[in-house]
Structure formats: C-alpha cells, structure tokens
Amino acid sequence: MKMDELFEKIIFHALKRHATDVHMKIDQQLDIEFRVLGKLEHYASYEIDIGHKIMNYIKYKSFINVNYKLVPQTGAFHYFIDNHIYFLRVSFLPGEHFESIVIRILNNHEKLTINELSLVKEFSGFLASICRQTSGLFLVSGATGSGKSTTLYAMLDRLIEMGGKNIVTLEDPIEMVKEHCLQIEMNEDHGINYHDSLKQILRHDPDVIMIGEIRDEKTASLAITCALTGHLVLSTIHASTALLVIKRMLNLGVSETDLEDVLIGIVSQKIKYDLKRKRVIILPEMMSRKAIMQYLHHDDFSYQTFKQSALSLIAEKKCDSYILKDELNEQ
C-alpha cells in the first residue's frame, strides 16, 4: 500500500470514531491509537518497516526535518478528505528505543458560535460582553486540548458579525482560516515572531488583535502596550486557573498597575467527557474586570469558579454529577 493511501485510511477511521488525536509509536512495530472522548483506543499495528515509512511521510507533509531524528520537532499541514479540510498539528518525539508522533485533528469546517461553546449558560454572555469592549486585554487559559483556540475563534466570528472592525491575528500556526481577518502565521525560522510582528501591526490601524499565545516577557509587554493604546487584545496563556493567569502575567514582568489598567476578563477552561451521551463539555471559570481589580487590591472578591459552573450544570440537569466529581470536591 502507498503511504498516502495508508495515511488517508488512518485519518478516515480516526474521523469516523470522532478522535481528537492520533498516536503513533514505533518500537518493535508501529502501534496506532486514537484518543476518543479522552481515552486512548487501539486502532491497528503494522510492521516496523511500514512504520518508518509512514512516519517519514507525515514528517515530510508537516515540514519536519527527517534528518534530525534525535530532536523533538513540531509541524502542521492542512489535509483534504471527505470534502472537508482539516488542520493537522504534528508533534514528533524521539526516545532512546522508539519514535513517536501525535497528530492533533482540528476541524476547520465545524464553526461554533459563542452560544454553542458550553452548556454553562453564563459563558456566552460573558464572552459577548468582552466582544463589546473597545480596548483591553482578555486572556483564555487551560491545558493543551482544552479548547482555548476554539473559544477565541468563536469570539472572532462574533466580532466579524458585529462589523466595523479591523481584525488582525498572529498565530502559530493558523488553525482556522477566517474571512474578513488579516491572519499572520508565525515562523521563527524566517524571523517572523510574535514580538516583531506585534510592533509592525500596530502601524496597520487594527481595532482587534488576537495573539495566539503569550509565552514570554516580550510578548506579554507588547500585549499590554497594545491594550493600553486603545486596542482590544485577545490571547491565550498557559495556566490552570483564572487566578494563576494573573500570577503568570506577574511572573512575566507585567506590573500590577498595568494589569489593573488593561485586564478586562479571564476565562480558564477544562474539557470534561460525558461518555454516556458521547459528548465533550467545556467547563469554564470566568473572572470579570471587577473581580480582577478586587483581587489585585486584596479585597474580598468572587467569580464563577469551576465548582460553581459544575453546580450550575447539575442544577439545570445538563450533566451528571459523577462527570464533575473533581470540581465538586474543590475547596
């Protein structure tokens, strides 16, 4: 079998099983698993020579250097199958006795509105209120695969629908193509990075700036500057809770005064899996500008935590309590 045919077969079956990720590992043989509703399921095994060939095929498609076999690398590419285009994000990791590739499958044609993101009714209203702002910094946090990009793209759709705004995005990589947005893909190898690109787009008269991720002090500082100069800035950051987002920004050198001036909202989100109904639930916690200010001033503050969102879902009979047991046990 040709490698393009084998790859198409693997992706076809992954999509059929609604997998979010494809795991491939070569040791004595090639083992392939799909992540379905949070759990890994075995799909197939192949002889080791086929394993090396399909791995090299995937590396080639995703612009991963096949000569650097001992170096972890990432890549990505768009893939057309079954009349749809999917964005495939690839991670290659070498071990002492094995090679591993994980492919994240991102659905380019499935567009969720902010009203469809979560069963938590307060979530859409909170995001809509952020979209109505003309300036400030809004941050979305969560673990890898928690839907941060999905939330930002849904907000972009709402902003596009509102009209009258020049929207520029900086992404690494571009996961979903949006009309009526100027999308710029980061490429460190060619000198295209968040810091330098942010400085450039400020001359492009933007109203809204989406930054794929705040990952270093330079990007954090420029994001603050953009928000201070009258732009609405949306971005993601790695932190597990809303409060840790604030601490993360402080650790990146942002002053409390600047956070008070520009941070208009925080969402931290988790993915929960309802195996009985075979669905994915985005569970958010939401921190408003008022709560952020109270926290920074060491006053009493309150915001919608994961536990409160979980209790809301249970009270409205939208979710069974056993799915949210970890959140319900939070102090």
Name each model-derived stretch:
Residues M1-Q331:
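Short, flexible helix-loop junctions that flank or precede catalytic/ligand sites
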